[in-house]
Design a protein with these regions (language model features):
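Conserved ABC transporter NBD signature motif
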Residues: 56-65
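ABC ATPase NBD coupling module
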Residues: 65-81, 105, 111
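Conserved ABC ATPase "signature" region
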Residues: 63-64, 111-130
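Conserved ABC ATPase signature
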Residues: 134-138, 142
Length: 145
């Protein structure tokens, strides 16, 4: 069994996980669903030990994950099956750069026309405020958009 108690995680001033507590029974299939930007990917990465929560504990069969050795953590991860939402983003480019890239590669539009299209798309998918951020700095749901 996996037990999550009072899990919190923030990135800068943005609180992503706010006191999550739940349990997952061994052998059961569980779904983690929610709105875009609600912290699903961050939560799963905490479960896998890929991100360290700011507060709270994650226990596997009564053993606190953060107190386990690297080998034990690896073995636990191998027992879990995860399906992540995929994205084809360039980590070295900002959100704006990722949207601009196909236009630069496959259109003959002027720079200002391309920028107008990028601005339009970012507004449509509610990512204007994230335009200068890199994929690692935004939620999985935002990456999907």
């Amino acid at each position: 069994m996996i037990e999550v108690k009072d899990l919190h995680k923030s990135f800068g001033d943005t609180a992503v996980l706010k006191g999550i507590s739940t349990t997952f029974e061994k052998g059961k299939t569980n779904l983690i669903i929610g709105q875009s930007g609600s912290g699903k990917t961050v939560f799963i990465k905490c479960l896998l030990g890929l991100i360290t929560p700011d507060e709270g504990t994650i226990s596997y069969e009564g053993r606190v994950y953060s107190k386990l050795g690297v080998e034990e953590q690896r073995n636990l991860r191998q027992e879990m099956g995860m399906v992540f939402q995929g994205s084809a983003l360039f980590d070295s480019m900002t959100v704006e750069g990722n949207v601009m890239f196909p236009l630069e590669m496959f259109t003959k539009q002027s720079r200002s026309e391309m920028q107008d299209r990028v601005d339009f798309v970012l507004e449509r998918v509610n990512l204007v405020d994230a335009h200068k951020k890199y994929p690692a700095e935004i939620s999985g749901g935002m990456q999907k958009r």
